Amino acid sequence: MASILIVDDSRTSRKILKGILESEGYEVVGEATNGQEGYDRYVELKPDVVTMDITMPVLDGIEALKKIKGEYPDAKVVMVTAAGQKTKMVEAVQNGANEFVSKPFESEQLKKIIDKVVG
């Protein structure tokens, strides 16, 4: 099953994502609390997929996405964000996001998106 890095500044969101992903059989190999830490963990771990929140301190999700995709164009990144951030989602896709999911989401919806991205 795919290895996944969760990048989100909310401890609650990370816990929920981890629970859903592990219950679906994915291996959560790491977590990060901001975009810079997410980039650093990506370089260290090279997971199959990154789930990336958009609004975070230090380096937001869009900037972290640009940084990861700039150096690792084949990286698979799924943006996870609050509903109502359509402009940010368009910006994320324009900068290489493979997919996105809006909170709140169902576990089956997330699984379908991860499976699609992993191929």
What does each model-identified segment do?
Residues 43-45, 67-75, 95:
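Conserved phosphotransfer cores of two-component systems
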Residues 105-114:
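C-terminal output helix
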